Amino acid sequence: LKLDLAQFRAMEAFAMFASDLDAASRAQLAKGARLVELLKQRQSAPYPVEEQVVSVWAGTTGQLDSVAVEDVRRFEVDFLDYLRREKAGLLAAIRETGKFEDSTRSGLEAAVKDFKLRFFGQGGDRLVEAGTEAAPEALDDADIDQVQIVKQR
């Protein structure tokens, strides 16, 4: 993780002066940006160690490569919630043994694959079925609050 972030910072500094970047450099910059987003936590809301392990694993093994940088934090929060609700045994295994074993890795890979289907809306349980949402209503003039600012000289 530390090496990935160091490479990202170096590439980011180089990219400021370069106009054309090859695909590998762009991919490295995107991965670094995802890692930076992944490491952000709300103040006074630390994650348990097992959740930190899962988050770092997901970021460093390319599990987040298909997630847009601006969606990484939401993906992380939702994925950890999904693990707590439906795959609690994976988190418990890390917490109780203090190890990240092959069985845990394979279970997490399957969980990420399943969760991505739900997250990106391509299967799994959806909150609202496609095509059943109500059409949005137009706002009346009375529903819109406007304030006029007048500059006096």
Regions found by a protein language model. Name each.
Residues L1-R153:
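Conserved catalytic/coupling modules of large nucleotide/cofactor-utilizing molecular machines
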